[in-house]
Amino acid sequence: MEDLVCVSNHNICIHISVNILFIDIYITILMSKQESDNVFWIYDPMILFRDGNYLKIFPTKDMTQIQVLNALTRLCIYLAIIFVLVSAISGYAYVPIIFILIIIVIYFFNNNKNSVQTEMFDDNYPNTNNSDNIDNTDNIMNKQNYKKISDYNPYMNLTLNDIGSGNDDLEANLVELPKDSNRKFYTTSSTTNPNKQEDFMKWIYDLPETCKENQACCLRHEDVRFKRHNPDIDSPTPNS
């Protein structure tokens, strides 16, 4: 029984290994096909019609930039053939040819642009900065005093021992403080843009209703003699 289990497990392992091998071969073939399709047609003209590419005449969002240019070139070739076969519009056969030339120019323009960007990120690309006017970064970093990592403070947090240290270069200029405090600050009347001119005019001329227009705005008449805490009535007079 144990021998049968071992044989069955061995067969399963062989089957899985064969499947993995076929998957690797398929992925390799698929990647090589994608790399071969991503070649501009001037380097391999047969790529326009090889492996079913002759049906790809309209660009899609899944295509690369080179595949889009190849598809447009293929479309221009088909249009040129149609214009030549139809004698009535054979004079328009030059239009697709002009578009093909434009596609070639676009390819070389984008290719040069990408090559320049690649060189800019290359380590061997020469430095275009003016080193005479810019100090060396390493020298600047060596001159400055940086907090170093220690066992008791691995995150370089500010500790109580750091308070009051590192300020040896501060200038004790006692004249600057009162001079800056006596500076005149002027706040303009208009603090918004555009200014609130309409609100300002309403505040000046748009008076609220008075007692003459609305009696609810009139002050209530109160007789001081009958107020509850009238000092003239409640408090005793000196002669009493």
Swiss-Prot record:
<keyword id="KW-0325">Glycoprotein</keyword>
<keyword id="KW-0472">Membrane</keyword>
<protein>
    <recommendedName>
        <fullName>Uncharacterized protein R468</fullName>
    </recommendedName>
</protein>
<dbReference type="InterPro" id="IPR043915">
    <property type="entry name" value="P9_TM"/>
</dbReference>
<dbReference type="Pfam" id="PF19066">
    <property type="entry name" value="P9_TM"/>
</dbReference>
<feature type="transmembrane region" description="Helical">
    <location>
        <begin position="66"/>
        <end position="86"/>
    </location>
</feature>
<feature type="glycosylation site" description="N-linked (GlcNAc...) asparagine; by host">
    <location>
        <position position="129"/>
    </location>
</feature>
<dbReference type="GO" id="GO:0016020">
    <property type="term" value="C:membrane"/>
</dbReference>
<feature type="transmembrane region" description="Helical">
    <location>
        <begin position="12"/>
        <end position="32"/>
    </location>
</feature>
<keyword id="KW-0812">Transmembrane</keyword>
<feature type="transmembrane region" description="Helical">
    <location>
        <begin position="89"/>
        <end position="109"/>
    </location>
</feature>
<feature type="glycosylation site" description="N-linked (GlcNAc...) asparagine; by host">
    <location>
        <position position="157"/>
    </location>
</feature>
<keyword id="KW-1133">Transmembrane helix</keyword>
